[in-house]
Regions:
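Exposed substrate/partner-binding surface patches
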Residues: 13-48, 53, 60, 64-190
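Folded extracytoplasmic luminal domains of secretory or organellar precursors
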Residues: 2, 55-57
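Active-site nucleophile-adjacent alpha helix/oxyanion-hole segment immediately C-terminal to the catalytic cysteine
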Residues: 1-11, 62-65
């Protein structure tokens, strides 16, 4: 059924068509990589549904040893946000989602620059917002013997969810702007 909603796409590759190899090209800026990833995804699935519901995450992984940053971009349809026991509004849930986490011990990735398994900091931010944002609340949390359902009530507006609050990475400056053009940044541990 989704195939029927897709815009007409010629079967032959077009001149200048983006490939996965182009996305992983070294030396391109994060913004250019974001644009290429977006075009690559839309070349595979471009429809009225993607126009309405598709957004893009920016995933950043920073090595704590050499400070090298690896940036990837991922499309999303739904944002699954965690709940804390004391969470009371959707804004807090979104802040938990973009909160930086430390990957160490068994979770340590291999740093692209060091070529060694290193402790890293990972966080998500929103690169592109969809026209219609779908938020899934993760209502089940870990418990000692079973997965407990979190039953706390979450306050959320029915219209016009305000995601303008942005905290810049290094400057720790609060910035108010339009969510269509600004990125929702994580609280960094430094």
């Amino acid at each position: 059924m989704i195939k029927n909603l897709q815009y007409f796409q010629p079967q032959e590759p077009k001149f200048g068509e983006i490939t996965y190899k182009d996305i992983e090209e070294e030396g391109i800026s994060a913004e250019e990589k974001s644009r290429r990833c977006w075009r690559f995804y839309l070349s595979k699935d471009d429809s009225i549904v993607t126009d309405l519901f598709l957004g893009q995450f920016r995933s950043t992984l920073r090595c704590t040893e050499c400070q090298h940053e690896s940036v990837t971009f991922e499309p999303f349809w739904i944002v699954s946000v965690p709940l804390a026991k004391d969470t009371i509004d959707i804004q807090e849930c979104m802040e938990l989602f973009v909160k930086a986490e430390t990957l160490d011990e068994d979770e340590m990735p291999t740093c692209e620059a060091c070529k060694q398994r290193r402790k890293c900091i990972k966080w998500y931010s929103f690169e592109k917002w969809p026209s219609v944002l779908i938020i899934h609340l993760k209502r089940f949390g870990p418990s000692a013997s079973y997965r407990a359902k979190l039953t706390n009530k979450i306050q959320t507006p029915l219209r016009n969810l305000d995601l303008r609050y942005v905290e810049l990475e290094r400057d720790r400056v609060i910035w108010h702007g339009s969510p269509k053009w600004q990125k929702f940044q994580p609280k960094m541990p430094w």
